[in-house]
UniProtKB/Swiss-Prot annotation:
<keyword id="KW-0472">Membrane</keyword>
<feature type="transmembrane region" description="Helical">
    <location>
        <begin position="72"/>
        <end position="92"/>
    </location>
</feature>
<dbReference type="InterPro" id="IPR023171">
    <property type="entry name" value="Na/H_antiporter_dom_sf"/>
</dbReference>
<dbReference type="GO" id="GO:0015385">
    <property type="term" value="F:sodium:proton antiporter activity"/>
</dbReference>
<dbReference type="GO" id="GO:0005886">
    <property type="term" value="C:plasma membrane"/>
</dbReference>
<keyword id="KW-0812">Transmembrane</keyword>
<comment type="similarity">
    <text>Belongs to the NhaA Na(+)/H(+) (TC 2.A.33) antiporter family.</text>
</comment>
<dbReference type="GO" id="GO:0006885">
    <property type="term" value="P:regulation of pH"/>
</dbReference>
<dbReference type="Pfam" id="PF06965">
    <property type="entry name" value="Na_H_antiport_1"/>
</dbReference>
<keyword id="KW-1133">Transmembrane helix</keyword>
<keyword id="KW-0997">Cell inner membrane</keyword>
<feature type="transmembrane region" description="Helical">
    <location>
        <begin position="97"/>
        <end position="117"/>
    </location>
</feature>
<dbReference type="InterPro" id="IPR004670">
    <property type="entry name" value="NhaA"/>
</dbReference>
<keyword id="KW-1003">Cell membrane</keyword>
<protein>
    <recommendedName>
        <fullName>Putative Na(+)/H(+) antiporter NhaA homolog</fullName>
    </recommendedName>
</protein>
<feature type="transmembrane region" description="Helical">
    <location>
        <begin position="36"/>
        <end position="56"/>
    </location>
</feature>
<feature type="transmembrane region" description="Helical">
    <location>
        <begin position="2"/>
        <end position="22"/>
    </location>
</feature>
């Protein structure tokens, strides 16, 4: 835990000195993640802490290297990491998984309920915002 605190101070110093190289933040970020996970703290908190210290504006200029990194990893995060994170934290047990359970009427009822509910909600919002 103390090591994590020291690494957070290093992140603060990097931000204070307006260091804009991605390599420094990547190395320190990985070290912070490893130290926090080893201390028993969830890795998601590490990502939030790192995001607080990454400089976006340096002396009035937008740091394009961080925006390039964001655009580079955004599809990977949106289509792989985030769904995997949600699935793993949803509490679904894979030991009871079978094709029979996927094709059950309960599963189809849940899927249809979510799909139709989303469509009805969107249409209701559209109707409520329409000028009369």
């Amino acid at each position: 835990m103390f090591i994590s605190f020291v690494i957070i101070i290093i992140l603060f110093i990097l931000n204070y000195k307006q260091v804009k190289h991605l390599l420094y933040y990547t190395i320190v970020g990985v070290l912070l993640w490893v130290s926090m996970v080893e201390a028993g703290i969830h890795g998601t908190l590490c990502g939030a802490i790192i995001a607080l210290f990454i400089p976006v504006n340096i002396k009035g200029q937008i740091n394009s290297s961080f925006h390039k990194l964001e655009k580079l990893i955004q599809p990977f995060v949106n289509y792989f990491i985030l769904p995997l994170f949600v699935f793993m934290n949803s509490g679904v047990l894979l030991k009871d998984f079978s094709f029979r359970s996927v094709c059950s009427s309960l599963t189809f009822g849940i899927i249809l309920g979510l799909f139709i509910g989303k469509q009805l909600r969107s249409y209701a919002i559209f109707l409520s915002m329409r000028e009369v």
